[in-house]
Swiss-Prot record:
Gene Ontology terms describing biological process: autophagy; intracellular protein transport; SNARE complex disassembly; vacuole fusion, non-autophagic; vesicle fusion with Golgi apparatus
Localisation: Membrane
Keyword check for Flavoprotein: no
Membrane topology per record: Peripheral membrane protein
Gene field: SEC17
Function recorded in the entry: Required for vesicular transport between the endoplasmic reticulum and the Golgi apparatus.
SUPFAM superfamilies reported in the protein's UniProt record: TPR-like (SSF48452)
Biological source species: Eremothecium gossypii (strain ATCC 10895 / CBS 109.51 / FGSC 9923 / NRRL Y-1056) (Yeast)
Family to which this protein belongs: Belongs to the SNAP family.
Protein name, entry field: Vesicular-fusion protein SEC17
Cellular component GO terms held in the UniProt record: cytosol; SNARE complex
Short name of one Pfam family: SNAP
Length: 291
């Protein structure tokens, strides 16, 4: 890719500090750095066209650094995003670094809605590509907070759900429960969220059962009936009422039967299956302790 390398060589030369008469002739540092960034962007796009994504990401990064130095942070934020897009398929860790630079610029400029969008993307890369669930949880929650500040409740819920689900899978049940409560608060009274509410109540109660807190689970079930009249008689309500009693009685067989019957008509997803298995195991462990 000789053409891209030639452009980079010209950009590097442009980016060198000028002094004296040369500085006056070239229009000052800002103009010189802007020219360098344009050359880097042109080279980066050539790398992108030839599918040399790591090289494209590196070159977009250099362009963004020139833009920052020139005082053009708005443009730099966009260019760091372009670097992220290139790195995403080739170097996920570097992709996260580029996106963090972009987010820092957006939030410094007060663009929290945009920052939230990319915080969510950042968390997805950390969860899916890097399996860094700790950082993913933190960034999903921050995305949810920023969306909440912007009154984008549906988007806020989407981010909080991701964080809560990861918390529960990591056995941080009370942290997960706190977020599910927040999600429910955002959703009660919203006609579009009516069917989702049942799922949120189910997840919240399962977290309490997994934490061996049947009192909190029963209290949550009663609150659900008060907050959402349609919850009474739903399959989620009937399952919870049954398995809470099964846990209290230490009846593993009844618990398994109730879960099996529910799953026949409302297929349980991987998250619910995992948490329900943990609850079942906890009943068995209590039985063993009593023997």
């Amino acid at each position: 890719m000789s053409e891209a390398k030639d452009l980079i060589a010209r950009a590097e030369k442009k980016a060198q500090p000028a002094s004296g008469l040369m500085k006056w002739l070239t229009g000052g540092d800002s103009y010189r750095l802007e020219e360098a960034s344009d050359l880097y962007v042109e080279a980066a796009n050539l790398y992108r066209l030839s599918k040399e994504l790591s090289a494209a990401g590196d070159t977009f990064w250099k362009a963004a650094e020139c833009q920052v130095e020139a005082g053009n942070e708005d443009e730099a934020g966009n260019t760091f995003v372009e670097a992220y897009k290139c790195y995403k398929g080739a170097n996920p860790e570097r992709a996260c670094e580029a996106l963090e630079r972009a987010i820092a610029i957006f939030t410094r400029k007060g663009q929290f809605r945009r920052g939230a969008y990319f915080k969510f993307e950042l968390a997805e890369v950390q969860e899916t590509d890097l399996q860094d669930y700790g950082r993913a949880r933190e960034n999903y929650e921050l995305a949810g907070d920023w969306y909440m500040q912007d009154q984008a409740l549906a988007l806020s819920n989407k981010a909080y759900i991701k964080c809560a689900d990861l918390n529960a899978l990591d056995e941080k049940y009370l942290a997960a429960a706190e977020l599910y409560r927040k999600i429910i608060s955002n959703s009660v009274g919203n006609r579009l969220s009516q069917w989702s509410l049942r799922d949120y109540y189910l997840k919240l109660c399962l977290c309490f059962l997994a934490a061996s807190d049947t009192v909190a689970a029963e209290k949550t079930l009663q609150e659900a009936l008060q907050e959402d009249s349609s919850f009474h008689g739903s399959r989620e309500h009937d399952l919870l009422a049954a398995i809470i009693e099964d846990v209290k009685q230490g009846d593993v067989e009844a618990f398994s039967n109730h879960v099996f019957e529910f799953d026949k008509f409302s297929k349980l997803d991987k998250w619910k299956t995992t948490v329900l298995l943990r609850v079942k195991t906890s009943i068995t462990e209590v039985e063993d302790d009593l023997l």
